[in-house]
Structures are given as structure tokens and as C-alpha cells.
Design a protein with these regions (language model features):
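A metal-dependent, Asp-based hydrolase signature
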Residues: 81-151
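Ser/Thr-centric signal marking residues that sit
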Residues: 75, 99, 156
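C-terminal cap/substrate-recognition subdomain and adjoining C-terminal extension
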Residues: 127-211
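Hydrophobic "anchor" residues
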Residues: 75-76, 107, 191
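Short connector loops/turns at beta-strand edges and beta->alpha or beta->beta junctions
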Residues: 73, 91, 122, 184-185
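Residue-level signature of catalytic and energy-coupling elements of molecular machines
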Residues: 74, 105, 160
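Asp-based phosphoryl-transfer active-site loop
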Residues: 65-81
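Non-catalytic pre-domain segments flanking phosphatase-related domains
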Residues: 1-70
Length: 211
């Protein structure tokens, strides 16, 4: 028996997928599980689905978990924080152009982050607090997820290519033990457009986890 995690509560799509797999649908709090005996290529289903799909190992032993690491933007929270900051100060279009360049492969993450940061140069850092208070919302299930790991003595960490201010606020709010994100330079309460240390890209995330 295989279990497919359907990361959505979109009932009709879950049932359609279950029918295709000859499986049974199980409703959980924030997702569906599809139990099937049929062999299938998950990559094919991922390509044709707007919903995240993952295989759940029925033999997985939770006792072996020692660390849970999560991204922040559009993961633990529902928004992209740097985009929300840009909207707040009227720079949404400029930031969107850089995002589009990155999506087209013209910029890697480090280059795109530095360009976005340079656009935000000069803004008052009080905008961060405003965005966190008024725009940042936890994704459904975030609190339950962190509570589960902490109650089972499993360490938690948020590692993000976003801004350290938001990652640390989230860390404090949820009681997450470890945190790593981009630390930006602020002088006289204004962003200088410079980053302190390395940009937290995929390699830096992997390095931090290895520590």
C-alpha cells in the first residue's frame, strides 16, 4: 500500500486523482491522503497538477527525526516578505521586474536578491514592523506543525533566503530554536542596500543545516 499526500483541501481534484489511482481518499486537517496499491510515477502527476504531491513512507519512524528545517516565505507564512515590503513603499513594479528576470534564468538567486535590496535602499526599517504586523499570516497548519515537533523533543529551524528581521520575528512567535536568513545593513534606521555576510542561497542553506 502506498500513501500519496495531496497538499490541498480541494476535494474534487483529490477524488479525481484517487479514482485515477484506484485508491481511497482520507481527509486530514490540512490535506488529503490517497491510499493505493497501484504503482505510479509521481513525477508525471506532479507535472499535471497544481497541487504539491509527495509520497508518504508508511514505514517511516518518527523517532528517527532529530531536526525539522523549513523555509519561511510562502511556506511557514503565506506571503513573500520582500515583495510585501516593496508594495508598502511603492516599489512593487521594480521588484517584480527583477523577479521576472530571475524566473527567466537571467539572474541567479544571489544576483536577484542583491538587486532587489539595492532598490529598497533608503527606506525606513519601520516598514518591516508594519509589514509583519499587517501582512504576514501563518500558513494553515504552521502552529500545529511546530508544536508537534517541539512536543516530541525535535529541534526546529527556519532557514530562509528572505530577510532576517522577519525570520527572527517568526522564530520568536513560534518558539523555533534556530534561525538563519539574510542580514541587511541598517544605518540611522534606513536600509543601505548592502547585505551583511553571504546571501542565504541554496548552498548557504545546505551549509547551515550541516553545521
Amino acid at each position: 500500500m502506498k500513501t500519496l499526500i495531496f497538499h490541498s483541501l480541494e476535494t474534487s481534484s483529490a477524488k479525481k486523482l484517487a479514482l485515477d489511482l484506484g485508491g481511497e481518499v482520507e481527509l486530514r486537517k490540512n490535506h488529503y491522503r490517497i491510499h493505493t496499491k497501484k504503482d505510479f510515477d509521481i513525477e508525471n502527476y506532479r507535472l499535471s497538477s497544481d497541487v504539491d504531491l509527495n509520497i508518504f513512507d508508511n514505514n517511516f519512524d518518527y523517532q528517527n527525526i532529530r531536526l525539522m528545517v523549513s523555509d519561511m516565505d510562502s511556506t511557514l507564512i503565506t506571503v513573500e516578505t520582500i515583495d510585501e515590503v516593496a508594495k508598502e513603499v511603492g516599489l512593487k513594479d521594480e521588484i517584480s521586474l527583477i523577479t521576472e528576470e530571475a524566473m527567466q534564468g537571467h539572474l541567479d538567486f544571489t544576483e536577484s536578491f542583491k538587486k532587489r535590496l539595492s532598490i529598497l535602499k533608503g527606506i525606513n526599517n519601520s516598514v518591516f514592523e508594519s509589514v509583519y504586523k499587517n501582512k504576514v499570516e501563518l500558513s494553515p497548519g504552521t502552529e500545529e506543525l511546530i508544536y508537534y515537533f517541539k512536543s516530541n523533543q525535535i529541534k526546529t529551524a527556519v532557514v530562509s533566503g528572505g530577510l532576517k528581521f522577519f525570520a527572527e520575528k517568526l522564530q520568536s512567535q513560534l518558539g523555533i530554536e534556530n534561525c538563519r536568513a539574510n542580514d541587511v545593513q541598517i544605518i540611522n534606521e534606513s536600509l543601505t542596500g548592502n547585505i551583511i555576510g553571504n546571501v542565504i542561497d541554496a548552498k548557504e542553506k545546505a551549509k547551515y543545516i550541516g553545521e
